[in-house]
Amino acid sequence: MNPLLSFCNVSFGYEDRDVIRSASFDLQAGSCTALIGPNGAGKTTLLRLAAGILQCRSGNVILNNESLYKFAIRDVARMVALVPQQLDIPFQFTVREVVEQGRTPYLGFLRGPLREDRMAVDRALELADVTELQQRVFNELSGGERQRVKIALGLAQQPRLLLLDEPTQNLDIGRQIELIDLLHFLHSEGITIFASIHDLQLVNGNFSSALLLSPDMPLMSGTPEEILRPSLLEKAFNCPPQRHPLLLERTQRSEKRAG
């Protein structure tokens, strides 16, 4: 089966500094993949490359068996949606008005929203469980509510691939669990999920595959169990196992098996 998205020896940098170096990996259709790595490793940059917002310096990004750069921006946005960390809305837009912006790739120069656009917005609100918030002002919502609305905005694009940039950041544990449950549900609906995750303890058991991005080592891909090995994480995060509960727990488990 051909991957939905592939990075083929992709490099990208700002001015004279490379952020992504010779990155290669595949995202299979229907997969649920976590992207982990230390701050400043380039996770946001990698997601923006996957969404076609940035263009790689060398290599290629393949989307649905074609070079992503052969597609018009509108066509990429119909297949891939990026949920950013921050969404700044300068006006007092309602939740519904924000989510309606996700239909932009489908609107023509002289064509306003059609019935199918309204239905897509209704469905996105429903999937993200924010239908009851649709008449609320976006800027007056809590952090957890805003996160769900941002996901609804992405879903209104009706993408095959949903990219999320640290969706659980700044959420308390209850809200984190709710959001992970939402990602599980969207995955069950056939949407391919690719999310950068700050809390490593959310990765195992919630994602089918994982990528590890670090400035000090090549991009690593595998199952969560393979990627969350203490030896890899210690090198990637420059953190001794005894200083992080997840690393300590996994190191102790490995020692017990060895004994």
Task: Locate each region found by the language model.
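Conserved ABC ATPase "signature" region
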Residues: E100, R115-L133
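ABC ATPase nucleotide-binding domains
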Residues: S231-G259
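Helix-to-loop junction immediately C-terminal to a conserved catalytic motif
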Residues: A51
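Conserved ABC ATPase signature
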Residues: V137-L141
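Conserved ABC transporter NBD signature motif
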Residues: G59-S67, V76
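The feature captures the beta-strand-to-loop junction immediately N-terminal to the Walker
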Residues: I36-P38
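Catalytic Walker B motif of ABC-type/P-loop ATPase nucleotide-binding domains
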Residues: L162-E166
